[in-house]
From Swiss-Prot:
Cystine pairings recorded for this chain: none
Protein name: Vacuolar membrane protease
TM spans (from-to): 17-37, 374-394, 408-428, 438-458, 476-496, 511-531, 581-601, 619-639, 644-664
Chain sites annotated for binding Zn(2+) 1: H154, D166, E227
Enzyme class: hydrolase
Cofactor(s) this protein cannot do without: Zn(2+)
Protein's membrane topology: Multi-pass membrane protein
Listed GO MF terms: metal ion binding; metalloexopeptidase activity
Residues binding Zn(2+) 2: D166, E202, H300
Amino acid sequence: PNGFVKFIRSIFGYRKTSLTLFVILTYVAVLLLAYLDHSLYYSVDLPTSHKEQELLHQAWVDLQHIAKYEHAYGSSGNDYVHDYLESRIVSAVAHKSYVEYDNDLNYTNNIMFGSRSELSGNSFNSVSYYESNNLVVRINGTDETLPALLLSAHFDSVPSSFGVTDDGMGIASLLGVLYYYTGKSTARPRRTIVLNFNNDEEFGLYGATSFLSHPWATGVHYFLNLEGTGAGGKAILFRGTDYGITKYFKGVRYPYGTSIFQQGFNNHLIHSETDYKIYKEKGGLRGLDVAFYKPRDLYHTAGDNIKNIDIKSLWHMLSNALDFTAIVTKGKIDLDADSLDSESSKSNTDTAVYTSFLNFFFAFPTSQVVVASILLLVLIPGISIPFLIIIFGYKKNWELSFVNVTKFPISLAISAALLNLFTNGFIVPFNQFLPNSSPFALVAILFATFLLLNYLILNGINLIFVSYKIVNHDEKLISIIETSFLYWVVLIYSTAKLANNVIGDDHSGEFPIIFLCALQAVASIFGLIGWSFKPVPKEHYVVVPQEEAEPLLGSSDNFNYGSPDVEDDRLVSDGSYDWSIQFLTIVPISTYLIYNSGFLVVDGINKSIQESLISQNLIYKLLQTFAISLSIPLLPFIFKVNRLFVLALFLISTIGVLFVATADSFNVANPLKLRFIQYIDLDKSAQDSFVSVIGREASPLQFVLSDIPSVKDSKGAVACVPTRDGLQDCSYKSSLDPKLVPGAKSFDDYLKVDILKNSSSNVDYPFGLLTGEIRIRVPKNRECVLDFKPSESTKIVSPFKDSPVKTVIVYKGKKSATTKEVEAESIPEGFSKDKDGNYVYKDLVGIDQLQLNKLDWDKSYHVGFQWVPNFSDVDINMKKSATNKLNVSVKCFWAELGKGEESTIPAYEELLHYSPNYVSWANSAKGLVSVSKTVEL
């Protein structure tokens, strides 16, 4: 018995070795739990039932076919995928009479719409014309009164990618759902299900937008959007429109998500968008956005291929789609009868706060989270203050000094400042892109450095003021209380923001603060209870040996820090070990919450350091915040860690310095991502083409291009110019011309612009609208962009900042000889069709750009414009014709990639072949080749 008691005392006594053991076990447990939670292999099981195995097998076969070629909207690979999907859909729907199929390829669902954005403080209005070939399936439910559920994914890729994750797995999952509900053993669902296999998401979210004009969109109230903004791994719940629909994600078998990502999207920290935006903002639907989210350096590159994907990733998305669909369609849900007057309906419209842990899903409305936060904010001081009054007002048994109270916040502030200096003064200058390859190594270095700094500063202060010490001051409890107050203040701010949660100022991902604050408060109150019951001190103090533990529910820390452990019988005679209760209350759970949140954020966005300087600055701030936050739960106990732990911190920091100086930022597993386009400017030359590559400044971009054979053979220079936000554009004249138009003798054959109508009569000038009309002839093409601006000569006298173009017209076919020019005032604002079925869009503020997307490879674009002449008083009298002119810049894109001898873009193939293995390639625009020409009307 004595040996057992001695063992327990040696483990749980407040000793350096005991504390260090607790710390090590805590970090091992946290890392292990987080790994199990985030691991695809340990958290997702492949199906065991024969039916689901068959579904997964067929979906995997479908994915292999989808990813056979790059399949951007402007490539023949897109037609291949469309036709393959159509054949699979037609085969599946033939089994059930209540399943319908429609193909937008019949030109019944073409759309035209405008979108306004802010560029450099100026309003920019773009109008898009899009010819849809969505594949839409409707599985009619038995209860026609129930609103329908939409499942959506897009079947196009970017030109540089095979689109396995983005969004082949989403499409394969939709096919899996279709196979399930058209299978012989599956009963007809009660709720109607609509499946939208949409096209051209990548450069305008066009497929989702066109679906809203489809007749089957009527009656749809809910949606599940399946996406990919990474390349494999687990599919995460990015965001939900509200709590009402998000809570149903709890029923899927492998839920994975956190509202931290939702906060990032809603606050525009993540710049890429998905079809979710269209369904929510334009369609007014309620739904979820489920997507793969990492790694970003393979996203939109050739690395997003079938070789880099695990079948478990597909099953994770497919199983979640099957489960969510089954939950929503098996009968009525409370959202079907939502009334704004009911309390449940009000909470259903709240933003959702959600997270998952080991396949358990937790979701709450923001209103409930706010109430819980307010209750906690009231309870903490309400309980703590009476104990403080008892301790300092009645018993007066806790004597504090200014040094005791201020040393922890001083240490925290100095350590944070030094850590920032270390980051921005050493890491960034020596290896600024290191977060791309080693984000968690940096977190470990910063974490160890921050702990070490606090250990040295706190114990240094103790050493300086050792002669002024008060024996029973309990610096551990002081640090716990001060940390609790810090969390309390942060929770006030977060709660105030969450109570008024809006898009652009979303705080739904800050829920861990509630738990951190509560845990810290419990530990501090526990310590205050101990002091409240501690006897009033005698007239003199007795110094207690360092290795003795604290009295029952109290503490008697001394300043012999740094002294060796005394491995003898001098343990606590009264058997109290309340420090362990405080440690177990604070450190394990707090550390997991902070690590899990930080891991997800860093793992999701660290690759975006290659996208901009703003992203780089954000990532380094997040790394420092992560390291500091991860340290805080341990800081109240940092006084007591033993020498070996301190030595480990020192070694990590020291080795970290060498690591930062020598580690590679880019490697095979974490490549440098560069963006390519080959461009021809016919205004300058019909014979020359240039390659433009965009990447980060100070990256190996210029070195990579200088080593390409055609560049060295031509002895041409690679010219690099800074563009925006830490990016640079490096270009060189290419000797490898694209081969996209058979029989073309020069690049003039790629793009011809015929001016059909140069202007209207000047009868009403300068007070009437001028009109112009052009035909754009571009063989083997689907995508062109027109930019409008006044003529250079007009700019001198123009008093207007807005675009002069007020109306654009896309002619459906050959213009009728009897067609009369439509009077401007008779055209309604926004989109309309004239009597001949031509597509018309009018915006009196001005139209800066027209984006054209068509399906017929060889059909010409036929476009008309109406614009306001620019004039001044001088112009009215002199009627200078120069002020009537309009420049129309036409740029057309090609995305067709051949292989080997049939290579259509040899300059791109050369870069793929000769670049170092640490480089991955993506497109920088709609296509991989662009040809431009400017005409003046």
